[in-house]
A protein has these predicted regions:
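Non-catalytic interaction-recognition regions
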Residues: 4-264
């Protein structure tokens, strides 16, 4: 990167956006020295907003084939990576027995959402300062800490809620079981997770919170019936939990820039 170009760009950005008082540069850690020098020069030139410039130093992303180096021609084009990942998602999905026996047919847009969700989540779940080894096959695993795992849970919740055609009433005297308590507790933590993610400039906090929420809900789902449960009171509380879990998944995914498919 050229200091001269970066100086001009920084000054022009502030000039074009007078309400902006600072900037966060999300750039790989190989440019740490560049930004240290850039910020120092801007401060010496007397720009008072220079104190509000911050380099969010990101770890480098490598592939299983090795480190990407532009000078050696080993850089993978992002469009090519996304295209290949979409095809991998499509092939993997169509090979599943439950997909072959289902009437559900996924379109290209849904495959795209799953592939991009896998890519974004795989990167965002890692602390920004750490290097990332992106494994395409691992990123689309439906049982691990992945974007598709979260997307699938969301689709399943939506499928449950579509079967409900009446208002849900809660019995305030209902005694929650441990699984229900755990999901409610995790939902309650969401606002503080947003704040900490903002304070620490770490989307990884949001991403891993989302995974924990889905794991907690899945544990409830696997151990207890949601719709045809042991009583109308338990059905009602689990539907309320499902609705609120769905809302948090939507909100958190939106903050992470991850789209949610309608079916999987």
């Amino acid at each position: 990167m050229c200091i001269r170009d970066s100086l001009g760009t920084a000054v022009q950005r502030i000039a074009d956006n007078s309400n902006v008082k600072g900037m966060i540069y999300t750039v790989g850690n190989e440019q740490d020295y560049h930004f240290k020098v850039l910020f120092k020069i801007l401060k010496r030139l007397g720009y008072d907003w220079a104190d509000n410039l911050y380099h969010l130093s990101y770890g480098m992303v490598d592939l299983p084939s090795g480190k990407m180096k532009s000078r050696e021609g080993t850089v993978v084009d992002a469009d090519d990576l996304i295209y290949d990942l979409i095809n991998t998602v499509k092939q993997t999905t169509e090979s599943l027995e439950k997909y072959q026996s289902s009437n559900e047919v996924l379109n290209h847009d849904e495959y795209r959402k799953i592939a991009l969700g896998a890519l974004k989540y795989y990167i965002l779940k890692v602390d920004p300062k750490k290097n990332i080894l992106f494994n395409p096959e691992e990123s689309i695993d439906l049982t691990g800490n992945t974007g598709p795992f979260i997307q699938y849970a969301y689709v399943r919740i939506q499928s449950i809620l579509k079967k409900v055609n009446k208002d849900v009433d809660i019995n305030m005297n209902y005694t929650l079981n441990e699984k229900e308590k755990e999901v409610i507790k995790t939902i309650h933590e969401y606002p503080s997770i947003i704040y900490n993610s903002y304070k620490d400039l770490s989307p990884a906090l949001l991403a891993n919170y989302l995974y924990d929420l889905v794991k907690s809900y899945n544990s409830l789902y696997q151990n207890y019936h949601i719709l045809n449960s042991e009583s109308s009171d338990s059905t009602s509380i689990r539907l309320i939990i499902s609705i609120n879990t769905s809302h948090v998944i939507e909100s958190c995914s939106d903050l992470l820039g991850i789209e949610l498919p309608n079916k999987m």
